[in-house]
Amino acid sequence: MKRLHLAPWTSLVLGLAFLSFHPVYLAEASSGSNSTSTVHHPENLETLEQCPNVDFCPQAARCCHTGVDEYGWIAAAVGWSLLFLTLILLCVDKLMKLTPDESKDLQA
C-alpha cells in the first residue's frame, strides 16, 4: 500500500521527463524540414495564369506546412495520457484513504 502513496509523485516525475524530451523532438523536426524562411506571395492571380503548364503542388508541399506534424501529435497524446493517468491515480489514492468509519455522502 505504500506504493500508492507515491503514485502522484511518480506521475509528476514521468511527466517532467517526457516534457524534457519534447524540445529535442521539436529541434529534430525543424532541422529536418526543407522549408525556407522566406515566403513568396504572388502580386495577383495573373502571375499564376502566366504559367499554365507549371505544377505548383511540389513546391507548395515543400514550403507550406499545415496542421500538426507527427511530433506534435505524439506530444499531445503523451500529455493527455499523463493527465488522465494522474487523475486516475489521484482517485485511487482517495479511495485507498477512505475508511469504513467515514460516510461516503458528506453533508454539505
From Swiss-Prot:
Q: Which gene encodes it?
A: TMEM213
* Principal location class: membrane
What is the superkingdom listed in this entry's lineage?
Eukaryota
Membrane topology, Cytoplasmic segments: 93-108
Q: So which residues are the signal peptide here?
A: 1-27
Query: Membrane side Extracellular: which residues?
Result: 28-71
Does the record bear Transmembrane helix in its keywords?
yes
The membrane-topology field of this record reads: Single-pass type I membrane protein
Listed InterPro entries: TMEM213
| Residue spans crossing the bilayer | 72-92
Protein name (database record):
Transmembrane protein 213
Give the source species: Bos taurus (Bovine)
Task: Give the positions annotated as glycosylation sites.
Answer: N34
Q: Which GO terms describe its cellular component?
A: membrane
Give the UniProt keywords, A-Z: Glycoprotein, Membrane, Signal, Transmembrane, Transmembrane helix
| Subcellular localization, as worded in the UniProt entry | Membrane
